[in-house]
Amino acid sequence: MAIAAAASAKVTKEVVTIDRDKRPYYLFVPDSLDARPVPLLIVLHGSGRDGKSLVDPWRDLASREGFIVAGPDAADRRAWIAPDDGPAFLYFLVEAVKAKHAIDSRRMYLFGHSAGAGFGLTMALMESEYFAAAAVHAGALQREGRDQLLNARRKIPMAIFIGTRDPLVPLEAARESRDVLTARGFSPHLVQMADHDHNYYQRAPAINQQAWDSLKSAMLAEDPRYQIYSYAQRR
């Protein structure tokens, strides 16, 4: 596979329809890809942003390494909320991409920043047999419902990148996430970034490279299994 040194392809805006509800997402497919299946990275944006804001910083790396990037919009851009934004929404999004492009279904990954980071960790645990691995920046596991999440069917690989000067997500919160995951048999990788704050975009190329290095070797041992959850109907 010939991989371009820099991205020339454009990010496109796509739509996935779920129960007549049209949800936008942004897609980057490197020009250099051939017909062989490639990994898929789902990126979850921070509060107040959109999917394109997180797809764009991944374009060059995706072109060099040869993978596809998809970034959905949260239903409410201020926060990612289950069940509106997943797991079902992410499943249908992935299946929509797979219907158009050759995806290595055993190498589908999650990356999230800030609000998308906490949600990314949650989705990774809920769908540990569907996604191969997850990496997040500036986020941690929510304490609410955490014990149930830790009963994940698979010890999915996870990496957490956190700035030592992050004013929004304390370093201790990331360390606590690492510790509770480790206590339950996971092997999380915590990267404490010295003199770094909450600003992902300031150091995006370096963060993305480290995140991808932590993700790319992870592979499901068998075809992905999507787990269906039941949620109480909202009034």
What is each residue range found by the language model?
Residues 3-40, 85, 92, 115-123, ...:
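A domain-start/cap signature at the N-terminus of enzymes
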Residues 31-36, 79-115, 130:
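Gly/Ser-rich "nucleophile elbow"/oxyanion-hole loop immediately N-terminal to the catalytic nucleophile
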Residues 33-79, 143, 167:
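Short substrate-entry loop that stabilizes the transition state in hydrolases
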Residues 54, 106-154:
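Primarily recognizes the serine-hydrolase "nucleophile elbow" in alpha/beta-hydrolase
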Residues 77, 193-200:
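Histidine-bearing beta->alpha loop at or near hydrolase active sites
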Residues 159-162, 166:
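Short beta-strand/loop motif that positions the catalytic acidic residue
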Residues 167-173:
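Conserved alpha/beta-hydrolase "acid-adjacent" motif
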